[in-house]
Amino acid sequence: MQLMDLKKQGIDIQENIPLSRFTFTKTGGPAQYLAFPKNLNELELLVDTVKENNIPLTVIGNASNLIIRDGGISGLVLILTKMDTIVANKDEATVTADAGARIIDTSEAACEAGLSGLEFAAGIPGSVGGAVFMNAGAYGGETEFVIKSVRVLTRTGEFKTYTHDEMEFGYRHSLVQETGDIVVSATFGLEPGDKWAIKAKMEYFNGLRRAKQPLEYPSCGSVFKRPAGHFVGPMIIKAGLQGKRIGGAEDSMKHAGFIVNVGGATATDYLDLIHLIQKTIKKDFGVDLQTEVRTIGKEKD
């Protein structure tokens, strides 16, 4: 079966679609094929078909901490945002969410059920799958602290469940970055708490985010990992790079280390500015800045 034949089976699959429509930076080239599976059956069929036809497969979440190069992505790109069911179980103190569900919505579902532990995620714009993949965190919380289990679809087409310990979480790292497994759902193990206290904590974190982050512009969030013994923002400021602009990409005047699209930016603008910051920080401070943001895709011809 050919990939586009799946359209006849009701699967939402398209050709040559600009990925800038979906990324938080509003940059990125086209996907050769782009599909939005609605359920596990469609996802499994898509994975089987690309395997059968030797087509490259890329999965992206909410594209909030992602740069896609201007040449786009060959093969099939999967966006799982239509797989977004969230189920809270107050008796077991768990929340299970599909990979395409927003982690913000998952945090809110936990709050409504009076379950504490996901408050840190109240302002994280990514998907559950992306949060697991990157071990997303904020305000002292990390995805790994609350993960109970993760269900995946392997690239060989088998469903598998990993325990917390099997996920090999690290700073902005998880096992699935190595295996290429597709996260399909995650179960969070939480603690009973007071709904209003949980809500107040979430609102506090959201207030901090609004005050400190440049939410008025498209961006990919925090670009760099925090190096041991250093803070990225102050180094960028001391190096004179806050406000530095290449094309339409600017290191934010509101929060150094966030690169925003102030108008017409390309992925190349973003990457050139990232490389300039890395080179300058290395020269001035002897520190190698590693990116937290994930970069995928090919250069434009």
Locations of the language-model features?
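Anion-binding (especially nucleotide phosphate/pyrophosphate-binding) glycine-rich loop
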Residues: 1-128
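Short, basic and Ser/Thr-rich N-terminal targeting/leader segments
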Residues: 53, 60-62, 146, 217-218, ...
